Amino acid sequence: RQFGKAVDGFNVSSCQFALHYFFENITTLQSFVRNLAECTKLGGYFIATSYDGKNVYNMLKNKAVGEGISIIDGGTKIWEVQRQYRNADFANDSSCLGYKIDVYQESINKLIPEFLVNYDYFTRVMENYGFQVIPRDEAIELGLPEGSGLFSDLYTSLTNEVAKNKSYAKEYKGALNMNANEKKI
C-alpha cells in the first residue's frame, strides 16, 4: 500500500534526539547521510536535535575519563553527562568522530552511551551530499530564528514571540515555565 509514496523523496527528513548515534565512526555517519540524501526530496528539509558537541566538550574539558557534570534538583539527580573519551582536541574533521559520552536522564534512569556531534564537521559532510543550511530569511519564514542553532536561541525566540503576541502564552505555557535546570539540559 505504501510503495512509491515518496518515490521522489520526503519533503522533510527528521532525526530527533538520535543524531549522536551516527557519530560513532565515519562509516556510520556516511551511511546515515547517504540515506538522508536518497530519501529527502531535492529542495526538502532535514531537521535534527542533539546536544551541541562543542558545548559538551567544553563542559567536560577539565574532567578525566569517567568524570562528569550532574544537575541535582531537590536532592534528585535529573541529568548527568560523563566523559568517556581520551582525546584532547575536538577538530572540525573526521577525527571528531567516536567521542563517547554517557548521558543520564531522569526519565530513563540509567546512563546511555552517546557520541559528541560536531556541527561544523556535520555541516561540511552534509554539503558534500547536496544539503545546505537554510539562510536566515528562509528560516524566519518557517518560524525559526536561524537555519541552525542552539536550544537557547529557540527559547529566546519563543519568549520574544509571546511578548509580542500574548495569545501565544496559553499555547506555550509549559515551555515558558521551564526552570533553569530544564533549560540547561
Regions found by a protein language model. Give the residues of each.
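Class I S-adenosyl-L-methionine-dependent methyltransferase module
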Residues: 1-4, 62
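A short glycine-rich, Lys/Arg-flanked "PGG" loop and its adjoining helix->strand segment in the class I
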Residues: 3-7, 20, 27-43
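Conserved acidic residues
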Residues: 11
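A conserved beta-strand element that flanks and buttresses the S-adenosyl-L-methionine
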Residues: 14
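Cell-envelope and extracellular/periplasmic
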Residues: 17
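Short catalytic/ligand-binding loop motif for oxyanion handling, primarily in non-cytosolic enzymes
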Residues: 21-23, 54-58, 142-147
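SAM-dependent methyltransferase
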Residues: 47-49, 53-129, 134-136
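Rossmann-like AdoMet/SAM-dependent catalytic core
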Residues: 95-185
